[in-house]
Amino acid sequence: EFLFARTMIGVFKNIEYMCNRTSSKTWGKEAWKKIVVCIVSDGRAKINTRTRAVLAGLGVYQDGIAKQQVNGKDVTAHIYEYTTQVGLELKGTQVSLKPRSATPVQLLFCLKEKNQKKINSHRWFFQAFGRVLDPNICVLIDAGTKPGKDSIYQLWKAFDLEPMCGGACGEIKVMLDHGKKLYNPLIAT
């Protein structure tokens, strides 16, 4: 759950950054209405119970209502949505909820019934949500990756400045505790 929380904290900070760009023609105070954070989890039996608790705390998951079958037909996925004003805080690996007075965040959570691996989750994202949301750009972030405070904005900007751009990627840096250095070059890469 702390890896998921680390990613979500970074995403929340990026949304706040875009909302604070008050002189922007695209972004600004209401920017959060243009952003939907889609979370896809691969398999109901596989999801970490503490991660489920974090999602419930954010308001985008309800425990106990998902069923394997409805009217005799197998369920493929469970979809939850919520606009949250709850934030997350990390102290070491301890995740806690905290009220956020500023920027709401629109969340869409897809809990796949079966574990069908990462590529299938990407397919779900593009084929199911992409068709409905019709986004200008999509940013895929693995749980545990912490985006910098403006990195999602910088990716958006790359697409905005070059409409023929079909893909972009950001830089990933190793997260180290303060005062720690990597002396082994194999680990550093």
Swiss-Prot record:
Name of the featured protein: Chitin synthase 1
A Pfam short name: Chitin_synth_1
Family recorded in the similarity comment: Belongs to the chitin synthase family.
Gene Ontology BP, a term: cell wall organization
Species this chain originates from: Exophiala exophialae (Black yeast-like fungus)
Enzyme class per UniProt: transferase
Cellular localization per UniProt: Cell membrane
Keyword line: Cell membrane, Cell wall biogenesis/degradation, Glycosyltransferase, Membrane, Transferase, Transmembrane
A GO molecular function held by the record: chitin synthase activity
Catalysed reactions, semicolon-separated: [(1->4)-N-acetyl-beta-D-glucosaminyl](n) + UDP-N-acetyl-alpha-D-glucosamine = [(1->4)-N-acetyl-beta-D-glucosaminyl](n+1) + UDP + H(+)
Domain of life: Eukaryota
This protein's GO CC annotations: cell septum; plasma membrane
